[in-house]
C-alpha cells in the first residue's frame, strides 16, 4: 500500500518519524525538533530560544528543526553513522535502528510552504540508509535558501556512492515559496525526474538503487553575513502531506 501521511491527529506517527536531526552526532536532547502537528499540517520552526546543533563539532553555527523517517548508527565512539558532515566524526549517542519509511523507487511528493529570512533555508531530501557505507547518495526534492527565495534546488549528491555523480542545480521558478506547492520526484532505475506542481523542472539519467529515508528540515545560520538583522525572524517549514503514488 502506498505510503501517505496527511499529519492528522495531534502528533507525529512515532512508528514512521524520528523528530530529531541526525541525533547520533549530537544527542536526542540537543537535536530535538521544534514542531507542531495541527489542522492536518506539520509545522517545523526554529524559535529564538532554540540552541545550536552540534555546537562543538559543526564548523559553522547551525540551528535546525528536522524530522527523518529512519535512523541508524554504530556504538558511541564509533565512526558508523548516517550523513557524517566531516572526516573522523564519531558517534556521540548511539541510536537504536528504526526504519519507519524507506522507499526504494517510486513517485514521492510533498506539499509544502516555508517562511524564510536571508539567514535560513528549508529542504526535503531522500538519503540512503547507509546500512552499508556506499549506500549514501541523496536525492534532493527541494532546497530553498531565503537569500535566493525563487531558486529551487534539486538534484543528486553522490557522497560516498561510487555509482553516482554529483549533479545539483537551483533553477529560478516563478513561484512564491511562502505559498503551498507540490514538490515531487519520480525515482526509477537509472533516472530521476524532479517536478514542481506537476511540471518537470529537471531530469537526471542516474538514480540511487537502494532504500532511502526522507529528511525534512528547516535550518538557521546565525553566523551568516547580516544575520543579526533577522535575529527576530522564526524560520518555518509547513507540510500538508507526504505521500507516494
Regions inferred by a protein language model and the residue ranges of each:
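GH16 jelly-roll
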Residues: 1-245
